[in-house]
Amino acid sequence: MYQADEKRYETMKYHRCGASGLMLPELSLGLWHNFGDTGVYENMKQMCFTAFDNGITHFDLANNYGPQPGSAEKNFGKILREEFSAYRDELIVSTKAGYDMWPGPYGNWGSRKYLKIGRAHV
């Protein structure tokens, strides 16, 4: 299992997010094109390790990130479960909803059913 750098918070600057009190790093790691099923899983893990070791605690996803829509969330979820579980309380994971995911009336645009079904596989 991954061991984070003990000095990971020494060089990154953090700022409050609005009036929420949440502290976010100056840099985040966006997982749009780098974490789909066409990518190399070991490279995905190393990107996450390097980011976290340098104080990046915010990972940005969306339900249509891939390629193959949804695959970035799936792959990052695997990394989170297998490698980052000891650090889960130090991470901010954001996502978005509302993009086309599958055919039919419930596969797009953020309906209540879409959001409930979409969470089931993550």
Segments predicted by a language model, with ranges:
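N-terminal binding-site loop/beta-alpha segment at the start of enzyme catalytic domains
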Residues: M1-I92, I117
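Structural motif corresponding to the early beta-alpha repeats
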Residues: E83-K113
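Conserved small/polar residues in nucleotide/adenosyl-binding loops
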Residues: A120-V122
